[in-house]
Regions:
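Alpha-helical membrane segments and immediately flanking helix-loop junctions
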Residues: 108-109, 117-123, 138-148, 152, ...
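Interfacial helix-loop-helix linkers and transmembrane-helix boundary segments
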Residues: 51-60, 78-79, 102-103, 123-138, ...
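Short, strongly hydrophobic alpha-helical membrane anchors
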Residues: 1-32
Length: 403
């Protein structure tokens, strides 16, 4: 009888021990268990920022939840080994892939960012840019942060591909940053995506001190002439002409620019309203969910918890600041050759980063601090949407040289 009880208790004890070892909780006591705990805390913090403070909630929310899922031990939703070396290992993919591995193919193959650009194009009004083509120059000047940070990151020991991925943070364009990084340095995708969207949310905090430091009260109070009306023909021709010119001169930028202008042409032509509304709403929302979850899934403890991530965060904010300064300084330079009454308020130069429409709103707010009756929003939207085009072109340039 005693032997029977002993064997029975041993069986129960062994069963409980085996069950405990098979749970995810046991994974927290493994070699990198502390890293999983740390990343789960980061995920909770990002969820807090997205929900409580509304920091880029549409993407930061899903990125944070993807980060949470991938760092739960033994969940087996995402496997970094399937994408090692920047390639999809199809020979072992089907047998080992989890849910997020399949969804990540949309990032790896460059599908999700391009689909988001279709939606962005359908929601973008290029009218202020068409009415004032000089805005193209301000949008281009704001991309200086991308290339200067690329050089700085390379000098600090990052590979050229990694440096290019870090530099693109300065464009303040999340989908472009994700697209370029997935092509050049997929191992940095998590930190770069978090940095890009965090700094986009912090536009009203980062930009104003730089704008005030580089301008005088008199410059901030400049009133600009009213923009001319833009005809429907101009609005229809613009996306077609831009697509042809950029795709011919820089083929590597064709996917992003082509999708951006496709969406805009849907909006402006007026004959495919159903398609335009679909890409603005249903398609955009679905892709944002998949993109955020899978980008967050790449933020594993091994990829995120290192000094390289800290360097990315620091270089990212420097890139963003340099882009802001570049636009403001070019506007001041252009004023040296502008007649009185036709000068540019330098504050709109900071909107050349492609955080639409937040950067343009910051220009408006800062301008009204000096002159409450000064309305810069529509003027700032020109450089702002030019920055969307500019960041895509910058990504194409980096991809053509580093890809």
């Amino acid at each position: 009888m005693c032997t029977l009880l002993t064997s029975g208790s041993d069986f129960v004890w062994n069963s409980l021990r085996d069950f405990a070892g098979s749970t995810g909780i046991a994974g927290f006591f493994a070699e990198m268990g502390w890293g999983n705990v740390a990343m789960i805390c980061v995920a909770f913090f990002l969820l807090y920022l997205a929900i409580r403070h509304k920091f880029e909630p549409l993407l930061l929310f899903t990125i944070a939840f993807g980060m949470l899922l991938t760092n739960l031990p033994d969940a087996n939703l995402y496997h970094t080994e399937l994408f090692e070396g920047g390639h999809v290992h199809w020979d072992i993919f089907v047998a080992n892939a989890g849910l997020l591995d399949y969804l990540y193919l949309g990032v790896k193959l460059g599908i999700y960012p391009c689909l988001i650009f279709v939606g962005v194009g359908a929601m973008t009004d290029f009218g202020p840019l068409i009415a004032n083509p000089k805005s193209f120059l301000l949008g281009a000047a704001a991309q200086i942060g991308i290339f200067t940070t690329f050089l700085g990151a390379y000098a600090l020991g990052f590979t050229p591909a990694q440096a290019g991925s870090i530099g693109i943070i300065g464009g303040a364009d999340g989908p472009t940053a994700i697209y370029l990084t997935s092509m050049l340095s997929p191992e940095l995708l998590g930190p770069i995506a978090v940095a890009a969207y965090s700094y986009m949310a912090l536009v009203p905090v980062i930009q104003p001190p730089i704008m005030r430091a580089l301008t005088t009260k008199k410059e901030r109070a400049i009133r600009m002439q009213t923009l001319r009306p833009v005809s429907k023909l101009e609005r229809i021709l613009f996306p077609i002409v831009i697509t042809v010119i950029i795709a011919l001169l820089l083929p590597s930028a064709a996917p992003l620019i082509g999708c951006l202008m496709l969406g805009n042409l849907m909006k402006e032509c007026g004959v495919v309203d159903r398609l335009s509304k679909t890409v603005q709403n249903e398609l955009m929302n679905i892709v944002v969910i998949f993109l955020g979850l899978t980008v967050g899934a790449t933020a594993t403890a091994e990829a995120f918890l290192n000094f390289r991530t800290l360097g990315i965060l620091v270089l990212g904010v420097i890139a963003f600041g340099l882009g802001t300064a570049g636009g403001v300084l070019l506007a001041k330079f252009m004023n040296l050759f502008s007649k009185e009454g036709n000068k540019i308020n330098p504050l709109i130069g900071s909107a050349g980063v492609s955080a639409v429409p937040m950067a343009a709103r910051v220009s408006q707010v800062e301008g009204q601090k000096e002159d409450p009756g000064n309305y810069l929003l529509m003027h700032a939207m020109g450089p702002n949407v030019a920055g969307v085009v500019g960041s895509a072109v910058a990504a194409g340039i980096l991809l053509s040289f580093l890809g």
